[in-house]
Amino acid sequence: MEPANHDHQHAPNRFAVIPTPLRLNANAEYTGAGVVVAFLDSGFYPHPDLVTPVNRILAYHDVAGEQQSLTSGGPIEAWHWHGTQTSVAATGNGHLSDGLYRGLAHESKLVLVKVSERGHIGEENIARGIRWVIENRDRYDIRILNISLGGDEDVPCSKSIIDQAAEEAIKHGIVVVVAAGNSGAEGRHSIPPANSPSVITVGGYSDHNQLNGNQRGLYHSNFGVTVDGTVKPEIVAPAMWIAAPVLPGTRIYERTEALSRLAAAADYQLPGLAHELEKAAELPEQLVSADAAVIRQHVEAVLKQLKIVATHYQHVDGTSFAAPIVTSVVAQMIQANPALTPGAIKNILVSTADRILTEPVIRQGFGVVNARRAVELAQTEPHALNVVGCKPPRVENGRLLFVFHDDEATSVAVAGDFNSWERLPLKRNGSGLWTTEIVVPGAGRFEYKFVVDGQRWIEDPGNGMKAPDNVGGLNSVVVLATDYTHL
């Protein structure tokens, strides 16, 4: 596959969508420069938005060994489309849209890992792909792994080779961002790797292609309690009206070029141009002899049907695109502060997210990703939080230890049914964590929340196990299987 070359208009049409940087009110000073992002997907194409004017793809690896390089000259397959769209949505520079449809991390470099085998994606190949990223993290300085796909089996993390690989990647300093899935309308929760406790699982929302935040509504992402008892997703990002590339070298690519030329033409040009482009645009034979108004009506109807927003882009939907948008925010955060750990990044993302007040909390986690605020907090985060520091309460020497992180808080307390919901103050230690401990209350299931600055009650950002609090929110849950009081 050789990158496509172009010498024609890249103009958007009247169905154009809001570019992602504008949609998220992102800080344009941060572009992901100096950050390497790995994408695990079905397949890829060396799209001009990734390789022009400079090829930013550092490496390509095919787990199945079907395609040795992106420019090996093999046929363009349907499964190349998905990975091309996800990688461009996050890191594309908008070359084929004159910069309009660029990702937030449009100066990041990429490592592309294909995990499909003749179009099929198996659990073993996904795990192999993650392990390859771990093994090559130092060689390419990989900081982020985006996974916009999933396995087939709904199993606990401890029994999933995919989840185990994802958790291992995080232990090695790689931020893992995963799509939640698109089956929430059927009441389904996330499965591997989106159920993995330490990954950042991303659900979706729609702003109906409007900049007014009041238009936000949730997408039908997978949500709820997983087989391990954790609640996913942690955050949501745009999952509708996202500009993504049409795959070069395909029939639809040629057709949309022709249709876009027709849409951009003046009325007096349309009849002659319709005759010239009849085959390429797949126009009905009788349309060629119609007047300009009829031709234009047909062309615009087809562009709308195909979701074409510019000559080489269409709008897409799904958490497959919400995840790379969050990945691009993470790239900006790491550019702003390269010392950030996966634990710190996840903590910042959930603590800066904005909940949609009209939607159920369990479907959106901590809410809508706030790109600008996350980068601001990343700039000033002085602490390198390890994974342990951002995990659920744990038992040490017969005492239950609670940990919370918020550099802007002036006071933090914990309250739960283990202490009749009385506020127990936490103290800030030298590593930037608020901590306290209590005598282990015995075996059982306990609910709790943190209270920040005496007013804000929030669930534990480091604990995925939650339960409804009966007032529209969630309590965090800790389960103690052993009665430590008798040890």
Regions found by a protein language model. Name each.
Residues 1-39, 49, 67-80, 215-224, ...:
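N-terminal domain-start motif of subtilase-like serine proteases
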Residues 11-14, 142-147, 286-321, 335-389:
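C-terminal subdomain of the subtilisin-like protease fold in secreted/lumenal serine endopeptidases
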Residues 24-61, 71-124, 138-143, 171, ...:
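Subtilisin-like serine protease catalytic core
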Residues 25, 98-100, 162-166, 186-190, ...:
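Short beta-alpha junctions and helix-cap segments that line functional grooves
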Residues 41, 61-62, 194-327, 331:
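Extracellular S/T/G-rich loop segment that most often corresponds to the catalytic His/Ser-adjacent loop
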Residues 43-46, 63-65, 96, 116-120, ...:
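Solvent-exposed loop/turn segments at secondary-structure junctions
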Residues 115-198, 208-209, 227-230, 307-323:
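Substrate-binding/access-modulating region of protease and related hydrolase catalytic domains
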Residues 391-445, 451-481:
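Aromatic-rich carbohydrate-binding modules that target alpha-glucans
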